[in-house]
C-alpha cells in the first residue's frame, strides 16, 4: 500500500448491528429526523366551536377509525402509536425547566384538560404511510410525505426554529379540548355536494383562563422592529375530514389518485395523508363517492366525513400552516438541510480557508400575544471543502501510530453533510472493518454493494474502495405498522463533508474575522435579507398562490412595536460609585479604583519553563505596579523554573512544592502556546487532587509589551476573585435575597452524562458565591443531588448572615420550550422539598427559565433604517408567549451583527415580584459577571454556573474539591 495513505483496515474490534441500512434504500422505513423544539404554544390550545343551541344529537365519531386530534397530527407526519416507555424513568436534568409558575396577584383556576388517547396502529386506517416518527413540541411537527401536483402532502415540517438539537422524550401525550358538537346534516342532495347553507353561527368555547400580568412601565419608550412578519387568516375555518375507503385500499398512492379524481367535489386545494383530509371549504356532513380501482376494476366506495372545524388562528392549525410554508420555501428552490432552508447556488466561497457558506433562512409560524406571525431569521451553513476522507488522510500524516484513535476522537460527535441528498448526520462511530466493497440488503431483499448503490442511485463513482465506513445510529422509532426499527446508517467518508467551523480555525483571529464578516449581518442587512425573502414569495406566483389557497397572507414588512430602555445601573466599588455609560463598559474605573474586597497575596508560586523566564519577570513586575490602584497587596512569588514544558514536569514540581509549602494561596503557571492537555492536567491537580486556586497563562498573551498592562490587570482581578475577593456590585433593593444560577453541560465523550453547575449568592449584596457540581448519570435520580446543593448553599448563607433568605430567585439555563411541561412538576418540587431540612422555613421563590438560543432579533428604528438597540432594551408584549409570564431583554452591548435578546420565562412567582421588579433585577444581575467589566447576555449566576459545569465536564471529569466551593475558582 502507498505509504502516504492511511492503513484503514485494522484489528479494532467491531460489534455490527443486526441491521445495516443506507439512506434512501428503504422506502417503507423513512430516514430518522432530529426534531428541534419550537417556541410556539402547545397543541390543544385552539378555539373549539359549538353551535349556540341545537337539540339534535351530537356528532359521534367513527369508533373504528380513530380521528380527532391524534389523527390530525398523524396526518401531518406525527407518529402517535403506542411506544414502550423509555428506560429513563426520570426526565434528564439537562435542558429541562424548573416548572411553571404564576404571579401571586393572578387569579388562577385549576382545570383539567382531557388527553386524547394514543390509538393502536391496528385501529387506524390501513396503508403504507411513509410518515416518519417525530415528537411534538409546542410548535414542532416532523414527517415526510410524497409530493403530488394538486395534493399537498403533510409531513416533515418543523413549526419553529431552534438553534440547538434536543432529544425528544420517548413518548408523549397530546392535549386537546372537547371535540366540537356539529349539527346533523340535512338530507344529501344528489345535485349538490357542497354546502349551500349559509355558514353556521359558531360560538367560540374557551375555558376560563387566568390573566397574565407581564407588562412593566419603567424605562424610556423606544420604537423597535422585529424579525416577525404578521400573518392574516382570511378563511373562516379549516375543515378536517376523515376519509374511508371500502373495501380497504392498502396502497397510499392509489388512495391519493382516487381522491384526486374527485377534485370537482373537494376542489383543487387539499391536504391529504391517506386518511385525514383538510380543506378550506365545508362539504356536507357525509359525502359518498365512487371510484374504480384500475388494477382489478373493483368499485371502491369513498366516504368523506366531517370531524373537526378548526379556527384559522388556533394552535391546532399552526403545525399545518408550517407544512404549507415549508412547501412555499421548496417552491422558491431552497434546499432543506437539517431544519432550515439554504440556497447552495448562492454559496460564498472562502477559498483561503477551504470553506463554503450557504445563505438561507430559518422560518416558522408561531402564535404569540400579538397574534399569528412568521418568525424568519437569516441562517448560514458553513460547509468545508474537505471531505471526511481528506481529514483522515491529514490525521494519518500527523500521527500514523495512533491513527484510528485520533480519527475516532476527532470525528465522533461531528456533524457531516452528504451533498448527494443534502442531509446531515451525526457520526457516532467508525467501522474500520467495513469498506465500500461490502454489501448490504435493501428493503426489497436484494443485496448490493455500497459501490454499486451509489453508482446506480446517484451516478457517483467511489474512488477509494478501501476506506472505512462512518456509522450514524438514529434513535429508535416505529414504522407505519408499529414495528420498532433499529439499525445503523453507514456513510462513506469520501462522500461526507464536515460542517461547522474547525477548532483550529476558531483560534485563528484572521480566519474568524473573514468568516464573521460574511455571516454577522448588521440590522440593516438582516432586514434587507428578510425583505428579499418576502419579495421572492410575492413575485413567485406559485409560492404566493400556495399561501393564498389556504387563506394566508403575509404583511409586506417586518412587525414594529414599542419597547422600553431600562434605566442605567449604579456600579459600586469600595470607595466610589458611578452610573454606567451608554456602552456599559467600566474597565477604566475598576482598574484605577479599589475593589470592594481584595485578598492579600503573600504566598504564591510561579511556575514557568526556562525559555519563558523573561516574560515571567515582566509579568510579576507589572502585577506589582497595578496592584496598588485596585487596593491589593502582593508579595514576590516563589520562583520555580522548569527544565522543560512536559506535563510530568509541571505536575511533579507543583506537587512537590504543595507538599512542602502548605500555605500556598495561588499556583500560577506559564505555559508555552495552547496546550489543552497540559491545561487539563494542571486544573485536575489544583481543583481535585490538591485543591488550591490556580491561574494558567499562555505565554503569548503576555508576550506583547504594548498589551501587557491591560492583560496583567485582567489577570490580577481574576486572581483576586479566585482567592475570594469581590470586585464590584450593584444596588439590590430586595433584602435577604438569594440568587441561584443553574446550567447543564452534556459530556459527549462519556455517555452523554449531564454535569450540573450550581452557583448561589450567600451574602446580602450578591457579591459572595457558593458553588457545587452534580454529575448526573442517565438513569440516576437527582433529588439527593439538588438537595445537597441547595441545602449546602442555605447553610453557607446562614453562616455569613446569621439568618436564612426570605426570597430565593433561581435562573435556570439550558432549557427548551418542548420540555417546559415535562419537567414543570419535577425540579421545582425538589428544590422546595429542600426547605424541609430547616424548621418552619418557607421562603418565597421565583424561578426563571433563561433561553439564549432563540431566533428573535430586535432592531432600533432610526430615521432611515434599522440599527442595533441599546443595552437594556426590554420587550414584554406582542411577541411574548400566550401561556407564560415572560419578557425579552437585550442586556449586552452588541458590537457585531443584530441584537439577539435573551428570553426569560417566569415559571414560578410566589414572591409577588411585579414585571418591573423581574426585569430590573435580571438587568442588574447582568452587570455582576466579574470576568468582564460590562454587561453580558445572561445574569451572572447563570454564567458562573455555565463556566463551572464546562470546567467540570470538559476538563476535570470530576467534582471539584469541596474546599474550593466558597470561591469563584473556575473563572
UniProtKB/Swiss-Prot annotation:
GO terms for biological process: germ-line stem cell population maintenance; meiotic cell cycle; negative regulation of circadian rhythm; oogenesis; piRNA processing; piRNA-mediated gene silencing by mRNA destabilization; positive regulation of cytoplasmic translation; positive regulation of meiosis I. The keyword Hydrolase applies. The modification Symmetric dimethylarginine is found at residues 45, 74, 83, 95, 100, 144, 156, 163, 549. Arginine methylation by PRMT5 is required for the interaction with Tudor domain-containing protein TDRD1 and subsequent localization to the meiotic nuage, also named P granule. GO terms for molecular function: metal ion binding; mRNA binding; piRNA binding; RNA endonuclease activity. Disulfide bonds: none annotated. This is Piwi-like protein 2. It comes from Mus musculus. The lineage of its organism: Eukaryota, Metazoa, Chordata, Craniata, Vertebrata.
